[in-house]
Amino acid sequence: GDEISVYAWTGDATAAPETRERVVNNAINKLTNGSWISTPQMLWKNNRDKHYFIGVYPISAISDLSAGEYTFDVTKQTESDLLVAINKDGLSYNVDEQQPVPLTFTHVMAKLVVNLTYKNQWGTEGPTVDKVAVGNAAKKATVNYLTKVVTPSAVASLCPDGNGFDIGQLF
């Protein structure tokens, strides 16, 4: 039941066009019985030009693939990883064969999980933890989906002592 957004265009591999000029614009591909089913159906522009593809998880309507806004959604923490796949070599359509589009996803932002465990040096109950501080935790960012570069635009508030971020503010 996973779903990804797929975008495709022709022309320059390093510059995705505006929404209206894309060959595929946010086609939602859902994993169904081991196959990806696209809505709407993805079609090739022609069989001459190379087509370039980007896949994004979770699904997202992105108007500017070189500067897309991303906001961490605290209500969907289990789906909070941001994965991106780019097919920058380009593919051309061949009418005589099935044409799968290889997309290998990598994390550009990931959920942080902190599990504190203690041995018995503080007794069976363990210590009381007031806070856990984490550095460089982004709540919002601008993502260049073409290069997978993430630029934080908002970070969690610093702890009062100025060291790291209060985990409670992130989740």
Feature locations, PLM:
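Short, low-hydrophobicity acidic/polar segments
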Residues: 1-135, 157, 166-171
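Acidic/histidine-enriched alpha-helical segments
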Residues: 134, 139-140, 144
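Intrinsically disordered, low-complexity terminal/linker regions enriched in Pro/Ser/Gly
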Residues: 142-171
